[in-house]
């Protein structure tokens, strides 16, 4: 078990992430025990584990999270979702989670007023805050704005768009007639363009860009709606759980009886075009108002569909009123309802074969005669002509006269059915175009300065059967994702580089290759489809084959059998293709691509409706619009038209300021109070929001040019401030407002603000005169104060400089005095020492005279002898003083002669005293002898000390020699590496690109799998594993293992070296490795365990560093930064066993600088004792805290995990110290003595060391 049991987030297939604790460090994975016992223990790769904070997180802006990672991001969304806080920021991007219910007062008029004019971040996140930011940015920057609302189907894009428009129209004043009409457009567009799908009850089946135009005073003056790609196939067919467009059901449920009679309307069961779900949306009240004759059998059995937003009966009346407010008369509204009803009746016209007709023609069935009559009446065409146009078409040959021969070509049943459906689609789609045109006519603008555009377009779609509509929708989403990547990720990072902000680079998946695959001019899918459609006999199988042929080796395009969904693998190669989109792989069935790409009718059918009596239908199909020969099928490319429209939209978005709202679908069942973590996480990843979170950890989303900020204030600046440079003025402004230096950063041309600091930013950018004058006054005050402070500091600096010069002069004199004294002592020290040595004899003679004074006999003789010795001493000293070049040998000879005479005199004295005072003299002589012995012992001790000092100097010199040799070897190795690096640089760059590409492919495979699982759950299908990704000839299913990157040559060589070792420790637990280190006597096993043990420690500490808290100081540094960084400058080496056995103990001491500590406590010392290649003891000394002493075997998690070679300590000058120096500090600070466990391990590693109890 690990001692470090911090909370972590670990990946889970259902919840996204769950909390747990790391209990084991494996060779390649961590073992995590979930805190919730209903989840089993699991082992996961390091990349699937993230640090966790204690306690739940609830932050308005995800950039405020203490730990910024996708797990804490998801947890914050989930926590807020269950608190009904559905909005969250990522910097200035709004994340909106669909609550699937109404939240009280969330969009009330009072809420609109509350957000009016308030800075982003000043109030809780809200869609109104984004709308208000767009208005203020438009006003300040004099630039039109766009709000892009994106997300999956059912994520809440349509509702977010409605509330955005509501705020834009109601925020400043009560809505006038123009604002009311803009808002009335929503129910009309939803009725004709929205439908129930399996994933969304109110799914927009078209895209729209709604522009709200403003004048110079920022008052609404008009609007304009652009729409894209209405899903026409839904008009004729729907799946069992889906419905046609809402307007059909509204008309059947809510139309008055008189209108229903006029339009001959019945119940949904009566119409082939309503063959899907036939239930109405209704609540308890409106259910009673719908006549029973209008209810389908299914509705009567199961009851109505429930939705808090949709009600077919009520919405028909809302639609009728909205059309009236948009300026349509009752006659015009009746014309619209008539065409809607005509489409329903047209769908009921069926065909049957004509008996005995050899040409294979067909006729309208007898049961459909009534539907034919009603349809012709509603369309205003002759019944016979309609019948003829549906079952045949007229063609005109090229020869046989001036105009050629007219030929009546009968149609087969399926051809007639296709013609009928094409007419229905044409009528409805052109009616939709007309309605959008009427809305635009009702909200015209004469003069517009700026506009705010809201983009709501169908989200990424994937079904069991995907056709041309899904292909176009997903292509659009690819373009929007590319715009998001460029606008937020790519361009943002390029701006940071240009401005020199030193923001770490964030990698993201660029989907430009998918867009090129679809829209390339020469061989893009759209181009190939158009070319196929122009052929005399187009074939979808030939088109599909051309797609596969043109893009045979493109990673983004695959065969249907490569899909993970079993249902898709049944398609033949010529029946479809698979595209790996940014959100996941989608398999498209191409059977109807050619038909759906053609937006034209047979000329005979178009001519029929052009000559009708219905005025509205004549408007939809104006005469002269078709220039084709009668009977020929025109070709109008839907794909090319959509691509052109999308290109124009992208140009608009690129010219505008941009705001993003990312809508998130919390669950697939569309119910409230349920949050599926894996589903939400997949959406966040696919939308690029996770990458934005990583970028904004260091990013600055708000910025303004120095020049723009200065020009904004220039008009109110006093004369003394006008001459200031723009940057100087901005710096003075920020200092005067007491803004924290962490909240902003100055670039080369702009000032940038951190996320969540929009209040301060808006405070500066607010252009009202009172605010500007107040800021200018503060700037002036700060400038005056700062100049006085600078003057005072200047004077103080001059005084300090003068004192420094005086101090240096004194230091020079002291240094000179010391140097002269040192030189003199060095020159004369031997003579000083010789004189001192001889003078010691003079001192001994005093005792001799004292003893001789007590003699009764021979006193004069002894004193005479002493005087002779004095003369000898004086003569010797005089000779030494007079002869500067006297040698040590000569001085020793003089000392020996004098000492011999002294000894002789002492012997005589002893002889004379022996008889007189034998006992007393013997005691005195013993003391003299002891003094002489003590002197001799002191002399020997001094000589021993000098020898030890010389030995220590020799050892240090040897250490320095070794260091220099190692340094020279390192320099030579670096030179060799540099030369080799130049040769290998291209190869390494290629490998890096391959690694990045391969990682993207693995991430794409994971997304494909998740998407297939979601689709399989919806359709009760099966998911199969796709073929493994192959890279550089290595299959992921091979022994190399899944998801393994192909490393560089150095790394592969190290892996091979490790693989050849005697012991396989990959399956050993962390605790087993530590026990083996502490107990084993097998040297080879011991070292193998130590290498594996420290390798796992490195991986663990690298993971902790990556997932540390943003505010964490470097209190937990295990070694000085220079030591840790040295490991990245060279590859680790695998040390041979024979070198390990003879490894020696080495000791080091280097300064320890903590970057975040106060200045007075910043410096410390770090001591390390290495037993061979691995650390055995570690000590950290700081003045402000107790010493930290760590011992291997018990404190491994807190100790340096690098090998001695990796630390680079052996190459640091002055870093290595002697054993006694380390032990002296270790024991002084309370450390126990280091012990080896016996002779079995003479140079034992850390396992042989125990921390004494």
From Swiss-Prot:
Organism: Drosophila melanogaster (Fruit fly)
Name under which the protein is recorded: Myosin heavy chain 95F
Coiled-coil portions: 900-1022
Chain ranges of the Myosin motor domain: 57-766
Main subcellular location of this protein, as a coarse class: cytoplasm
Gene Ontology terms for molecular function: actin binding; actin filament binding; ATP binding; calmodulin binding; microfilament motor activity; microtubule binding; myosin light chain binding; myosin VI light chain binding
IQ domain span: 808-837
Keyword rRNA-binding assigned: no
Signal sequence, renumbered to the chain: none
């Amino acid at each position: 078990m690990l001692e470090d049991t911090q909370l972590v987030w670990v990946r889970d297939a259902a919840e996204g992430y769950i909390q747990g604790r790391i209990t084991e460090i494996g060779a390649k994975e961590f073992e995590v025990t979930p805190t919730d016992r209903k989840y089993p223990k699991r082992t996961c790769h390091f990349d699937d584990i993230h640090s966790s904070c204690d306690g739940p997180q609830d932050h308005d802006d995800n950039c405020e999270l203490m730990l910024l990672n996708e797990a804490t991001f998801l947890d914050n969304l989930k926590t807020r979702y269950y608190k009904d806080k559905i909005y969250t920021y990522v910097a200035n991007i709004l994340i909106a989670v669909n609550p699937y219910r109404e939240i009280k007062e969330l969009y009330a008029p009072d809420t609109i007023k509350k957000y009016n004019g308030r800075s982003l971040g000043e109030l809780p996140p809200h869609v109104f805050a984004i709308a208000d930011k767009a208005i203020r940015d438009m006003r300040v920057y004099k630039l039109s704005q766009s709000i892009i609302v994106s997300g999956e189907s059912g994520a809440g894009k349509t509702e977010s768009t409605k509330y955005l428009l509501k705020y834009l129209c109601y925020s400043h004043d009560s809505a006038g007639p123009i604002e009311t009409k803009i808002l009335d457009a929503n129910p009309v567009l939803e009725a004709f363009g929205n439908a129930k799908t399996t994933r969304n009850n109110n799914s927009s089946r078209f895209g729209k860009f709604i522009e709200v135009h403003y004048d110079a005073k920022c008052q609404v003056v008009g609007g304009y709606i652009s729409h894209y790609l209405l899903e026409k196939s839904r008009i004729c067919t729907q799946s069992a759980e889906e419905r046609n467009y809402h307007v059909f059901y509204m008309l059947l449920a809510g139309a008055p009886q008189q209108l229903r009679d006029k339009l001959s309307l019945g119940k949904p069961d009566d119409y082939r075009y309503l063959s899907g779900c036939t239930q109405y949306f209704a609540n308890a009240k409106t259910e009673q108002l719908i006549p029973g004759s209008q209810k389908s059998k299914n509705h009567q059995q199961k009851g109505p569909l429930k939705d808090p937003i949709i009600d077919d009966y009520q919405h028909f009346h809302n639609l009728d009123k909205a059309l009236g407010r948009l300026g349509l008369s009752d006659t015009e509204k009746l014309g619209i309802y008539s065409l809607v009803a005509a489409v329903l009746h047209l769908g009921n016209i069926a065909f049957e074969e004509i008996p005995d007709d050899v040409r294979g023609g067909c006729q309208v069935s007898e049961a459909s005669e009534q539907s034919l009559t009603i349809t012709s009446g509603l369309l205003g065409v002759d019944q016979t002509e309609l019948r003829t146009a549906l079952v045949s078409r007229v063609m005109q040959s090229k020869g046989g006269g001036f105009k050629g021969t007219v030929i009546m070509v009968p149609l087969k049943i399926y051809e007639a059915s296709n013609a009928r459906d094409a007419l229905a689609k044409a009528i409805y789609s052109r009616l939709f175009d007309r309605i959008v045109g009427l809305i635009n006519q009702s909200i015209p603008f004469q003069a517009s300065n700026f506009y705010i555009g809201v983009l709501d377009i169908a989200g990424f779609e994937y079904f069991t059967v995907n056709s041309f509509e899904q292909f176009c929708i997903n292509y659009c989403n690819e373009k929007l994702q590319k715009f998001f990547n460029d606008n937020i990720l790519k361009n943002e990072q390029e701006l940071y580089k240009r401005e020199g902000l030193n923001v770490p680079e964030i990698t993201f998946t660029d989907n430009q290759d998918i867009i090129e695959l679809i829209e390339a001019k020469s061989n893009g899918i759209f181009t190939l489809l158009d070319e196929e459609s122009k052929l005399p006999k187009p074939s979808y199988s030939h088109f599909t084959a051309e797609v596969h042929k043109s893009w045979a080796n493109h990673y983004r395009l695959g065969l249907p059998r490569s899909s993970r969904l079993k249902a898709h693998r049944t398609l033949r190669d010529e029946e479809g293709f698979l595209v790996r989109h940014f959100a996941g792989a989608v398999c498209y069935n191409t059977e109807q691509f050619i038909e759906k790409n053609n937006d034209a009718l047979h000329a005979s059918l178009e001519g029929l409706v052009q000559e009708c009596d219905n005025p509205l239908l004549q408007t939809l199909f104006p005469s002269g619009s078709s220039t084709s020969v009668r009977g020929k099928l025109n070709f109008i490319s839907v794909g090319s038209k959509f691509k052109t429209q999308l290109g124009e939209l992208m140009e608009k978005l690129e010219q505008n300021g941009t705001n993003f709202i990312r809508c998130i679908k919390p669950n697939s069942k569309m119910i409230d109070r349920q949050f599926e973590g894996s589903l939400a996480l997949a959406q966040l990843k696919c939308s690029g929001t996770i990458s934005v979170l990583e970028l904004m950890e260091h990013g600055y989303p708000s910025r303004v040019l120095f020049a723009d900020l200065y020009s904004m204030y220039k008009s109110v600046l006093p004369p003394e401030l006008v001459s200031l440079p723009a940057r100087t003025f901005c710096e003075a402004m920020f200092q005067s407002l007491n803004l924290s230096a962490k909240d902003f950063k100055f670039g080369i041309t702009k000032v940038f603000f951190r996320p969540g600091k929009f209040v301060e930013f808006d405070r500066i950018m607010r252009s009202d005169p009172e605010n500007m004058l107040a800021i200018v006054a503060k700037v002036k005050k700060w400038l005056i104060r700062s100049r006085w402070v600078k003057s005072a500091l200047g004077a103080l600096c001059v005084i300090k400089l003068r004192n420094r010069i005086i101090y240096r002069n004194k230091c020079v004199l002291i240094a000179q005095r010391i140097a002269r004294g040192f030189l003199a002592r060095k020159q004369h020290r031997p003579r000083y020492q010789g004189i001192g040595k001889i003078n010691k004899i003079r001192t001994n003679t005093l005792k001799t005279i004292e003893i001789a004074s007590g003699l009764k006999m021979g006193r004069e003789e002894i004193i005479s002898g002493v005087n002779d010795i004095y003369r000898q001493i004086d003569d010797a000293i005089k000779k030494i003083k007079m002869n500067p070049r006297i040698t040590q040998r000569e001085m020793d000879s003089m000392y020996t002669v004098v000492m011999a005479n002294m000894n002789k005199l002492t012997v005589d004295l002893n002889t004379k005293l022996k008889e007189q005072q034998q006992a007393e003299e013997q005691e005195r002589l013993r003391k003299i002898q002891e003094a002489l012995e003590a002197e001799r012992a002191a002399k020997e001790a001094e000589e021993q000390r000098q020898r030890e000092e010389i030995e220590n100097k020799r050892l240090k010199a040897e250490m320095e020699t070794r260091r220099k040799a190692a340094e020279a070897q390192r320099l030579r190795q670096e030179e060799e590496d540099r030369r080799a690096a130049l040769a290998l640089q291209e190869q390494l760059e290629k490998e890096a690109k391959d690694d990045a590409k391969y990682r993207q492919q693995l991430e794409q495979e994971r997304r494909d799998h998740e998407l297939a699982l979601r689709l399989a759950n919806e359709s009760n299908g099966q998911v199969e594993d796709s073929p493994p990704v192959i890279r550089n000839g290595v299959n992921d299913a091979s022994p190399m293992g899944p998801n393994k990157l192909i490393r560089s040559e150095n790394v592969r060589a190290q892996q091979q070296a490790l693989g050849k070792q005697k012991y396989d420790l990959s399956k050993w637990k962390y605790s087993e490795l530590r026990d083996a280190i502490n107990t084993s006597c097998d040297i080879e096993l011991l070292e193998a365990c130590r290498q594996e043990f420290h390798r796992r420690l490195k991986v663990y500490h690298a993971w902790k560093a990556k997932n540390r808290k943003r505010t964490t100081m470097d209190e937990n540094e295990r070694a000085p930064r220079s030591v840790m960084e040295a490991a990245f400058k060279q590859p680790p080496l695998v040390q041979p066993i024979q070198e390990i056995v003879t490894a020696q103990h080495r000791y080091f001491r280097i300064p320890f600088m903590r970057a975040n500590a106060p200045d007075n406590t910043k410096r410390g010392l770090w001591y390390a004792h290495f037993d061979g290649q691995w650390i055995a003891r570690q000590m950290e000394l700081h003045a402000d805290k107790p010493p930290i002493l760590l011992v291997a075997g018990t404190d491994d998690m807190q100790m340096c995990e690098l090998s001695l070679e990796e630390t680079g300590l052996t190459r640091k000058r002055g870093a290595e110290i002697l054993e006694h120096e380390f032990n002296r500090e270790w024991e002084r600070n309370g450390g126990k003595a280091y012990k080896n466990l016996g002779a079995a391990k003479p140079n034992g590693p850390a396992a042989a060391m125990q921390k004494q109890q």
